[in-house]
Amino acid sequence: MAENEGAGNQPVALDIDTLEASIEKSRMQRRRSARISGILYPLAVVLGVLAAWEAGTRLLGVPTFLLPPPSAVAGSLRANASLLLFHGWVTTIEIVLGFVLSIAIGIPLALAIFLWPIFSRSILPLLISSQAMPKVAVAPLLLVWFGFGLLPKVLIAFLIAFFPIVISTAVGLSTIEPEKIYLARSMGFGSVTTFCKIRLPNALPEIFGGLKISITLAVVGAVVGEFVGGDAGLGYLLMVANGSMDTQLLFAGIIALTILGVALFLVVELAERLAIPRHIIAGDNATHLS
């Protein structure tokens, strides 16, 4: 009898294993399909816009200095590749240094805001007020104080980029389920151990959300600095192209700046995936299942 019952349970176990394998395979297929569609759909939109742009400028006879066709912009990209690479490298250095400075100051500042409520009540109004101040108005002062070198551009990138890091880090450290803290205390964790093993990992998604916003704002800050007082960089190149009415080079510089910004954003996103892969996977699964 026992042997018959054991034999009767085997098909049920096999059916459950088969069902789980089928569900996992279906999830993988949905993820793959979502990745492909996430690439193909935007690409189709871009190609459609470029085709309409090319056809419209040629059929309507729009002057090149007003709106060059994409083919002319592509030609300018090829012809000025070395120039764009040189100025792009200068802008990249300014962005990265401003971004690193934002992290080096923003995260400790957020930690102080989280740890000391009095400090938080004192400093937060000043931080919010600083964001209401237009950075373009501050840029000439930085040029007067620090000259026309690299430092003013880095500082402008920092001033624009550090605020999201401060806010997202402070929110991430403050937002945690009380049950996790109770569990850590019941296991005998001290304050430092609880912070390092529970609170900080829990805050990583919020922190990286702020970092991704910050890196895009650092691009804006570097370009603003180059507009005001640069002698190199993509922002400076855009000013030169605008002054000489070289619209093709102007569009080429905008494209190069866009590619640079997207590339830096993807670097931060890759760091996020390496630091918190479970969070990313869980987010993807929730998106696809919904």
Indicate where each model-derived feature is located.
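Periplasmic/extracellular loop-to-transmembrane helix junction in inner-membrane transport proteins
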Residues: S22-R32, R58-I103
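Generic hydrophobic transmembrane alpha-helix motif, especially the helices
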Residues: L127-P164, V171-T175
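Hydrophobic alpha-helical elements at and bordering transmembrane segments
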Residues: L77, L84-G88, T92, S122-S130, ...
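C-terminal transmembrane helix and the adjacent membrane-cytosol boundary/short C-terminal tail
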Residues: P117, P205, F251-S290
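Transmembrane alpha-helices
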Residues: L155-L159, S191-G225, A252, A256-L257
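N-terminal signal-anchor transmembrane alpha helix
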Residues: S33-L59
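Short cytoplasmic-facing helical segments at TM-TM junctions of multi-pass membrane proteins
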Residues: I165-S168, G172-I213, L234, L238
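Transmembrane-helix boundary motif in ABC transporter permease subunits
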Residues: G98-L127
